[in-house]
Amino acid sequence: MKGLVIFFCLFYGCHVAGATGKTIMLFPQKTDTDYVTLKPTERVLNQITVCLKSYTELIKEHSLFSLAMQGSGKDNTLLIYPYPPNNISISIHNEDIYFKVDPEVLQWKRTCVTWDSKTGLLQLWINGKLYPRRITKSRSPIGPQISVILGQEQDSYGGSFDINQAFVGEMSDVNVWDYVLPPENIKAYFSDDYTLDGNFYSWDGGNYTINGLIVVLRNQFIPKL
């Protein structure tokens, strides 16, 4: 598999983990005013992969990644929403799909979600484990104009946050691709041997705006699984 990962890196971009420290965003308090807005390029997505790393003591539901489109009923175009200790909801075009997952433990969690609008195939990976695949009802693409928020759940385009859905903890390595990332590269993301840069949004090179009292910690290191 190592050879496949190196081949992927040559064409799609990545760097060896450990060469530089990680940028971590710390969400220190329960509030409806602290969040991060990601600013990817605007284009239509027929496929998507979202990968992120999170670390929290929360034992209640919370929003990690919220992608909304403009218009009625499009606030949960893609939502990653854990229900600790052992459930998570992935929403696609406001269809909530629930997964039973391994119980939460107090460690960094790696989460990847992939979706293909042509087939409706939805895949959830957590800490290297692929959970039973699902098929969504929607076959509509995502975009082109989207709002992407970390740490809050959008009930309208770009806002209408609920304090009871807020994330408290740390987040890092949020990357988005405009295709379904192959399993060998998802496993590489979990292994931390390589950091794969998203071609739609890259944590290391993407634009973002911090709102509220979020603390940016640079040159940090995240323990391996």
From Swiss-Prot:
Stored InterPro entries: ConA-like_dom_sf, Pentraxin-related, Pentraxin_domain
GO terms of molecular function: carbohydrate binding; galactoside binding; metal ion binding
Leader sequence segment: 1-19
SUPFAM superfamilies tied to this protein: Concanavalin A-like lectins/glucanases
UniProt cofactor(s): Ca(2+)
Record: residues binding Ca(2+) 2: E153, D155, Q165
Family in the record: Belongs to the pentraxin family.
The protein's role, per its UniProt record: Calcium-dependent beta-galactose specific lectin.
Protein name, as recorded: Jeltraxin
Lineage start: Eukaryota, Metazoa, Chordata, Craniata, Vertebrata
Gene: PXN1
